[in-house]
Regions:
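Extracytoplasmic electron-transfer domains, predominantly the class I c-type cytochrome c fold
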Residues: 56-117, 122, 126
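Amphipathic alpha-helical interaction segments
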Residues: 14, 41-42, 108
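Bacterial N-terminal signal peptides
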Residues: 8-19
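Periplasmic/extracellular electron-transfer cofactor-ligation site
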Residues: 25-26, 31-58, 72-73, 84-95, ...
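Alpha-helix capping and helix-coil boundary motifs
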Residues: 16, 29, 111-114
Length: 132
Protein backbone atom coordinates (compact mmCIF):
# COMPACT_ATOMS: atom_id res chain seq x y z
CA UNK A 1 0.00 0.00 0.00
CA UNK A 2 2.82 2.42 0.85
CA UNK A 3 4.52 1.71 -2.49
CA UNK A 4 1.29 2.50 -4.32
CA UNK A 5 0.85 5.77 -2.40
CA UNK A 6 4.47 6.75 -3.08
CA UNK A 7 4.17 5.91 -6.79
CA UNK A 8 0.91 7.86 -7.02
CA UNK A 9 2.43 10.86 -5.31
CA UNK A 10 5.47 10.65 -7.59
CA UNK A 11 3.23 10.48 -10.68
CA UNK A 12 1.22 13.51 -9.56
CA UNK A 13 4.44 15.43 -8.87
CA UNK A 14 5.72 14.59 -12.35
CA UNK A 15 2.48 15.62 -14.03
CA UNK A 16 2.31 18.95 -12.21
CA UNK A 17 6.03 19.51 -12.57
CA UNK A 18 5.91 19.23 -16.34
CA UNK A 19 2.58 20.99 -16.81
CA UNK A 20 3.81 24.38 -15.69
CA UNK A 21 2.06 24.10 -12.35
CA UNK A 22 3.90 25.82 -9.56
CA UNK A 23 3.27 26.75 -6.00
CA UNK A 24 2.07 30.30 -5.51
CA UNK A 25 4.78 32.86 -4.87
CA UNK A 26 5.25 33.65 -1.20
CA UNK A 27 3.37 36.75 -0.14
CA UNK A 28 5.69 39.74 0.10
CA UNK A 29 4.07 41.85 2.82
CA UNK A 30 6.17 44.92 1.96
CA UNK A 31 5.21 44.79 -1.70
CA UNK A 32 1.56 44.20 -0.83
CA UNK A 33 1.53 47.14 1.63
CA UNK A 34 3.29 49.33 -0.97
CA UNK A 35 0.78 48.43 -3.67
CA UNK A 36 -2.21 49.17 -1.44
CA UNK A 37 -0.86 52.36 0.16
CA UNK A 38 1.65 53.93 -2.26
CA UNK A 39 1.25 52.71 -5.84
CA UNK A 40 -1.72 54.93 -6.72
CA UNK A 41 0.60 57.94 -6.64
CA UNK A 42 4.11 56.49 -6.96
CA UNK A 43 3.21 53.77 -9.47
CA UNK A 44 3.57 49.99 -9.32
CA UNK A 45 7.23 50.38 -10.31
CA UNK A 46 7.85 53.21 -7.79
CA UNK A 47 8.83 55.76 -10.44
CA UNK A 48 6.18 58.37 -9.55
CA UNK A 49 3.87 57.46 -12.42
CA UNK A 50 0.80 56.12 -10.63
CA UNK A 51 -2.73 56.75 -11.88
CA UNK A 52 -3.24 59.58 -9.34
CA UNK A 53 0.08 61.33 -10.17
CA UNK A 54 -1.47 63.68 -12.73
CA UNK A 55 -3.67 65.23 -10.04
CA UNK A 56 -0.72 66.79 -8.20
CA UNK A 57 1.10 70.04 -8.96
CA UNK A 58 4.43 68.22 -8.62
CA UNK A 59 5.07 64.68 -9.81
CA UNK A 60 5.28 62.18 -6.94
CA UNK A 61 8.82 61.17 -6.05
CA UNK A 62 10.59 58.44 -8.00
CA UNK A 63 11.16 56.08 -5.10
CA UNK A 64 13.61 53.91 -7.04
CA UNK A 65 16.40 56.49 -6.77
CA UNK A 66 16.29 57.27 -3.05
CA UNK A 67 19.62 55.52 -2.41
CA UNK A 68 21.19 56.97 -5.56
CA UNK A 69 20.18 60.48 -4.46
CA UNK A 70 21.67 59.85 -1.01
CA UNK A 71 25.24 58.81 -1.92
CA UNK A 72 24.28 55.14 -2.31
CA UNK A 73 22.70 54.84 1.15
CA UNK A 74 18.96 54.33 1.46
CA UNK A 75 17.65 57.07 3.83
CA UNK A 76 15.60 54.76 6.08
CA UNK A 77 14.76 57.29 8.81
CA UNK A 78 13.89 60.13 6.42
CA UNK A 79 11.60 57.87 4.38
CA UNK A 80 10.03 56.47 7.56
CA UNK A 81 9.33 59.99 8.84
CA UNK A 82 7.72 60.97 5.53
CA UNK A 83 5.48 57.90 5.50
CA UNK A 84 4.31 58.34 9.08
CA UNK A 85 3.63 62.04 8.50
CA UNK A 86 6.36 63.60 10.66
CA UNK A 87 8.57 64.96 7.87
CA UNK A 88 7.25 67.51 5.37
CA UNK A 89 7.49 66.80 1.66
CA UNK A 90 8.08 69.19 -1.26
CA UNK A 91 6.42 72.57 -0.76
CA UNK A 92 4.86 72.38 -4.23
CA UNK A 93 2.90 69.31 -3.21
CA UNK A 94 0.39 69.71 -0.39
CA UNK A 95 0.75 67.18 2.41
CA UNK A 96 -1.22 64.37 0.80
CA UNK A 97 1.06 61.86 2.50
CA UNK A 98 -0.26 62.75 5.95
CA UNK A 99 -3.23 60.55 5.18
CA UNK A 100 -0.98 57.50 5.43
CA UNK A 101 0.69 58.60 8.64
CA UNK A 102 -2.73 58.88 10.23
CA UNK A 103 -3.90 55.61 8.68
CA UNK A 104 -0.85 53.74 9.96
CA UNK A 105 -1.25 55.24 13.42
CA UNK A 106 -5.01 54.60 13.59
CA UNK A 107 -4.60 51.02 14.78
CA UNK A 108 -4.86 52.29 18.36
CA UNK A 109 -2.50 52.72 21.30
CA UNK A 110 -2.25 49.00 22.04
CA UNK A 111 -1.00 48.17 18.56
CA UNK A 112 2.06 50.38 18.14
CA UNK A 113 3.97 47.50 16.53
CA UNK A 114 1.47 47.16 13.67
CA UNK A 115 2.09 50.54 12.00
CA UNK A 116 5.84 50.33 12.64
CA UNK A 117 5.97 46.86 11.09
CA UNK A 118 3.90 47.94 8.10
CA UNK A 119 6.00 51.05 7.46
CA UNK A 120 9.20 49.04 7.90
CA UNK A 121 7.92 46.42 5.45
CA UNK A 122 7.20 49.13 2.87
CA UNK A 123 10.67 50.59 3.36
CA UNK A 124 12.24 47.13 3.03
CA UNK A 125 10.41 46.75 -0.28
CA UNK A 126 11.56 50.21 -1.41
CA UNK A 127 15.16 49.27 -0.62
CA UNK A 128 14.79 46.24 -2.89
CA UNK A 129 13.51 48.24 -5.88
CA UNK A 130 16.34 50.78 -5.87
CA UNK A 131 17.98 51.49 -9.22
CA UNK A 132 21.48 50.06 -9.49
Amino acid sequence: MQKFAFKSLFAVALIFGFSGFGWPKAVDFGEMAYRTSCADCHGIDGKGNGPMAARFKAKPTDLTVEAKNNNGEFPFEAVYDIIDGRKPIAASNPRHMTIWGQAFLSFGPDSQGIPRNRISAIIDYLKRIQAK
